[in-house]
Amino acid sequence: MTNSQIKQGPASIESAVDEVLAAPGVVDSAIKAEEDGVQAVVIDCMLDPGLDAAREAVSIPVIGCGEAAMRAAGTNFAIVTVLQRQERAFADLARRYGLADRMTEIIGIGVPVLALESDRKTALAATIEGSRRAMERGAKSVVFGCTGMLGFADEVSSALHGLKVIDPLPNAITAAHEAIQNSQTTDKAVYPYPDAKPIVGFRECAALDALMRSQADD
């Protein structure tokens, strides 16, 4: 298993603007991964930036942490995320994945993504409190709304009497391994390669730029 950072984009992803800025780098990284022989890609963000675009660009499975986590959560799940401003984004994702009727609520803990690393103790306490609120209001499971909450699941579950907690990154990695074991590929009838057209301004995303230019040459 390997990991890579996008070469251009925001320091964290908390808004629709952040998603747009991150997507080209996500697609570029997915293309490079396939070229390097990687068998599946996981997008390390709960908002699934560039997910559909990456699936169009490659034939290997591309797993979105958000989609995989919501599907693993079962019924009556809440999303406990960094900021309340993400409520609309997660509601939109749940509808897109056909899971809106399973989601009870979205709770922001008031800790920005970058602060998850700088003050883990405060972030963990806020995550436990947000998860407690969700459980008290009827949630049967909690999905972390940020992969930066990695490692919090056991402590949150223990503090809340065994509440089911989905830690999105390891969950998505498991889904990727299963896709590889089952020899899955991206269905190109559903996610066809992009149509030929000139593009400008993406030279830093060399693999994405090359894909579009090769399609145009075809």
Task: Name each region found by the language model.
Residues M1-P24, V82-D119, D209-D217:
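N-terminal glycine-rich anion-binding loop in soluble enzyme alpha/beta folds
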Residues S15-K32, T122-E129:
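Glycine-rich, highly charged phosphate/nucleotide-binding loops
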Residues A22-G25, A78-D92, A126-E129, S183-K197:
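A polyampholytic, Gly/Pro-enriched intrinsically disordered region
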Residues E35-C45, A139-T147:
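Periplasmic-binding protein-like
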Residues R55-T75, S158-A176:
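Short, acidic/small-residue loops that bind anionic groups at enzyme active sites
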Residues A123, R132-M135, A139-L150:
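Charge-patterned, long linear interaction tracts outside catalytic cores
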Residues K140, T147-A159, K164-P168:
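A C-terminal functional module that forms or caps the active site or interfaces directly
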Residues T174-A175, S183-D218:
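C-terminal functional extensions of proteins
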